[in-house]
Amino acid sequence: MSEPWLSIIGLGEDGLAGLGAPARAALGAAEIVFGGARHLALADAGARGREWPVPFDVAPVLALRGRPVAVLASGDPFWHGAGGTLTARLAAGEWRAYPAAGCVSLAAARLGWRLEETICLGLHAAPFERLLPHLAHGARALCLLRDGAAGAALAAWLAEHGWGASRVWLMEALGGPNERVRESTAAAYALQDAVSPALLAVEAAGGRPLPRCAGLPEALFAHDGQITKSPVRALTLAALAPRPGELLWDVGAGSGSVSIEFCLAGGRALAVETRAERVANIEANVRRFGLQDRLTVVEGHAPQALDALPVPDAVFVGGGLDQAVFDAIWARLAPGARLVANGVTLETEALLATLHARHGGELLRIELARAAPLGRMRGWQPARPVVQWTVTR
């Protein structure tokens, strides 16, 4: 078996001094060395150095397949680094990796935190809202930042969302001669002159965590009244049974609340909606929950809008189901995929009863009532009943 042509080398802020002998040998043998400007300088790559293109692309590395090439990355190349991007396109024998201590390991070591109990997030290229589902009293998070100035922005975001009492540590240039760790609270954050690479450690306090169960309060979502109500949504999510990595079609998405909760459970979603104002609400909710990488809005009419979509693992139809929409969905479902349809009109109820008789599954009638003033007393105020059909292909 031939030697790997590509060496993926993790580099710390201590540069060459922090490399072991095997990594040094691999770097010395490379004809071409790829990396960011800072890494190339730390490794003293000289004329062999090639900066990454903007936007980032590994094609220049792959074009040199067979020649001795080294790629430099921060710390562990497989934590928000180039390592995973490269190895996904290479055979196992083509590469060898030499990881160094990553920033999260160094941060945990400085603070004495157990990594297995700490949330580690790369917020250098992701919205701060990605942190929201993880915030709970006493929760600890290590957040990689775009640059030192982003520490102030993240602290301000925490304070704005009710977590101003959280303790935060701005951790700069860990492992190098310019290492610095400074502490504050999110609300009182006034740390200046931060340098990169930077990380903000957070010990959460003071806010209201998101519930972990299905059926989040409607007040958390932007909507125009067209939203699956919390108790019905909880039953709907139970019927959809989201599993990590699965894809949901949310047809007639309204506010996107079902899609949002499906994604919070680890899935992905395509929210199909026709009305522009509701599309705007869904997009606002996607930003609010930091789900830009999991939830995509598809503006269009079903069934036509479904034609180009990838095959789903689950489908939810919250309104507007008719025979044509059902036929389009049913034709695309793979064996084992789930379909959940809710209806409130007599026409939709009749269709669901017919489909249940033909295809089986479970037909459920959901009737809810809330206590409300009735003169000087209280009485039950019923909501419109919802008929829910659940079936597995």
Which residue ranges define each predicted feature?
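Class I SAM-dependent methyltransferase SAM-binding "motif I" and its flanking Rossmann-like core
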Residues: 75-138, 299, 303-304, 357-378, ...
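C-terminal substrate-binding/active-site "lid" region of AdoMet-derived donor-dependent transferases
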Residues: 328-387
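S-adenosyl-L-methionine
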Residues: 272-314
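Class I S-adenosyl-L-methionine
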Residues: 1-106, 266, 273, 296-308
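A contiguous loop/helix-start segment that scaffolds small-molecule binding in enzyme catalytic cores
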Residues: 2-10, 21-25, 67-69, 138-225, ...
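Conserved SAM-binding loop of SAM-dependent methyltransferases across substrates and taxa
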Residues: 255-267
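Conserved alpha-helix/loop element of class I SAM-dependent methyltransferases that forms part
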Residues: 227-244
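Conserved class I S-adenosyl-L-methionine
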Residues: 245-254
